[in-house]
């Protein structure tokens, strides 16, 4: 379990301080085949519906489809998702009947996107039959743009299986979504714009959520993830619960559109080296490393990493400045002017802005929880293992830092590297959104 200290706040917590709040999200890990599904008992309005959800992407595997919401069978299918990082809504029944693919890419792993797709095929103007919005703004530029015919009867709201986080055409499963979802609304018989679900924060262009208070229709649903033992529970009043697969209680996390946490950046890592909502990184004999999605230039912050597997001294970890090359090994995190500080765990050495370093205690082992307390205001970094700070560190009192007098004036960021010979190394981060470390190995947790 987590050993969070209280003297420093948790890194990355942000969001609105007043108004409507979203308390949690659901983490979908494609390696666990995370998904949920439901088969409606009756066919309802196939012409008119609205889908609304907040989405934060995990790994950025750009191959193929990553499905957010879908309905598929042997010859008829409809889906909302990402295709090579483009937001897409498509439907086909022997031929392609709807196909809207945005020009712009959605590749920011630090961002929550509010996606709204409203269909009303009774509209006389073709482009008004399907409207796509992201963060309150309508998408108008598409690389592919095929609208349904007037009074077209689509494939949502039929009596076939509907899925969240995956698609299952012809009984096979494909295109697992990887990342987080929150506030999943589906309205049966209503085509609403995003103002029903969100609003611009006063005097800004920042889109924030608000409570939906309207009707849902017969097959409508509202999934919040607030019940960790039944993440697909419907809170619309319809009891249209979705059955989950590959999801566990620890996949309810605090990361949300109104409380956005730092994760490790999937832009730095290849898609097969990062997983579990960008909180777990793994080695691949390629000297690959990465930074967190948020940096900080002032304040005091704390986070942890479970060293799931230590191999050849890795994962190395620490704090680096925002322009540091993430592929450089841990020693180089402190190997040049203004770089930051990094630990090589097979030697328990912290390097600080030079190629030399100081040794603090015994080496870190698989199963250890490594602690990082960073006082950016006073340019000090504290490092601990399993609840005890090395160098008799006292972050609250300001003594015993393993690195101090750092001079870089830009943003500092969390950092990890797996080395060139550490193919089995792995580390799981906790920036405050999930202190269970359930996504690490149980045998490791029992050691701390």
Region spans (language model):
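Aromatic sugar-binding interfaces of carbohydrate-active proteins
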Residues: 139, 156, 160-161, 165, ...
